[in-house]
């Protein structure tokens, strides 16, 4: 009996010991640290190979995740590393981005010691990836230096992160009506090329506000300021189905500095220069013509150069309107001078015609003419009587002559002749009356002949010199000659006063300032200043930023 009872007790003790041993082993396994596991995994890379091989075993990368079942959701976000430049002529912009896509592929689930499998670009070609393309992209380049810039990660639950670095040149439709005070919303549109929204849709990873990041240092724009960006999504219908399109709008506002220096200030200075001609004398035709032609050619050059930085649009921009108005002011200044010159010439021609017309006849004119004729006849009779008296005086003096030496008489005779000839000639040259000049000349010549006859030889061959040097005859003869000169001068002066018409009035010189110039000096600057005020107030206060909805 005793031996039978001892055997079950020993068996019970051995069972308890075994159970306690198993419990201690299990506790030791549970207390093992993860670091030791990871260390073991590093030491055993064949574990990763085994996991990847198991994932790709029977995997078909031609089929999307959940094929024939639920819709595949692709989450996206964009990080901009460089934005710019923007081309107005080509209407496009360029930027470098990190384009990230995330989706879930349950076929790539795995159970292993590592949370994330960080793989290179070689794995990309072995699994399914979204067929994303940029709808408004003109040229997109994936960087491959020094290796393809792609990132691929697989998580335990089958979530996949696919990132690549791209340089995208996208189209940016621009409405340049308000150029250069304009703003634009340049879109970036992307979506699936083959899968409609019934099979694949796109969403933003971090929501609409934070899914697109553009750091300030990434902007490399010269003519624009990057104000911000907005995101949206839309559905586009086509013959192959409806597709989800994701859109990012980059809002740009143009800088005015370049165009102020290059176009606006030169145009304003050219208009002011054209108005300087209003202050130049209207007789200075070459100077004013040079001002007008030079300013017109300058405005033409400015208008051509301003269009070089723009596409060949069919509508007028804000700068085109400003240049057109400035050109109109410059051209009007040239036309204003042409009008001034034309009306000045007309006034001078009218004044010359008035001067060339004979003065109206006065009723007393015939009476004056008759009086002038009578006066001329009286002067003629007086000159004849005076000539007779002179001849009588010469003959009486020749009878009272004394005998002198022949040499002295000859010299005195020549002196008298020279004086008698010079006196009437000088008087004739200064006398304006033809009647008085003729009568005086005859009288003086007769007196000279009388003196010469006094010295002529006698019939007996002897000379009869006149004694001009006697004291009795010299004063009488001199006084008579003086009276003759006085009478001739008086007669000639009277005839001159009655016969000579008054001198004509000088023609108008046309000097002075034209009334057109006076008005233009005030009208042109005031009008141009008012235009500038309205122009700048309207465009600077106007919201010229394009709305995102207008581009959709």
UniProtKB/Swiss-Prot annotation:
Residues 1-35 form the signal peptide. It catalyses: chloride(in) = chloride(out). Residues 396-406 have a biased composition (Basic and acidic residues). Residues 36-259, 306-318, 539-552 are extracellular. It is a multi-pass membrane protein. Residues 500-509 have a biased composition (Pro residues). 4-aminobutanoate binds at residues 100, 163. Keywords: Cell membrane, Chloride, Chloride channel, Disulfide bond, Glycoprotein, Ion channel, Ion transport, Ligand-gated ion channel, Membrane, Postsynaptic cell membrane, Receptor, Signal, Synapse, Transmembrane, Transmembrane helix, Transport. Its main location: membrane. Expressed in the brain. Pfam families: Neur_chan_LBD, Neur_chan_memb. Residues 445-458 have a biased composition (Low complexity). Gene3D superfamilies: Neurotransmitter-gated ion-channel ligand-binding domain, Neurotransmitter-gated ion-channel transmembrane domain. Glycans are attached at residues 47, 144, 157. GO terms for cellular component: chloride channel complex; GABA-A receptor complex; GABA-ergic synapse; postsynaptic specialization membrane. GO terms for biological process: central nervous system development; gamma-aminobutyric acid signaling pathway; synaptic transmission, GABAergic. The chain crosses the membrane at residues 260-280, 285-305, 319-341, 516-538. Belongs to the ligand-gated ion channel (TC 1.A.9) family. Gamma-aminobutyric acid receptor (TC 1.A.9.5) subfamily. GABRA4 sub-subfamily. NCBIfam families: LIC (TIGR00860). Alpha subunit of the heteropentameric ligand-gated chloride channel gated by gamma-aminobutyric acid (GABA), a major inhibitory neurotransmitter in the brain. GABA-gated chloride channels, also named GABA(A) receptors (GABAAR), consist of five subunits arranged around a central pore and contain GABA active binding site(s) located at the alpha and beta subunit interface(s). Alpha-4/GABRA4 subunit often assembles with delta or gamma-2 subunits, in combination with beta subunits. Heteropentamer, formed by a combination of alpha (GABRA1-6), beta (GABRB1-3), gamma (GABRG1-3), delta (GABRD), epsilon (GABRE), rho (GABRR1-3), pi (GABRP) and theta (GABRQ) chains, each subunit exhibiting distinct physiological and pharmacological properties. This is Gamma-aminobutyric acid receptor subunit alpha-4. The lineage of its organism: Eukaryota, Metazoa, Chordata, Craniata, Vertebrata.
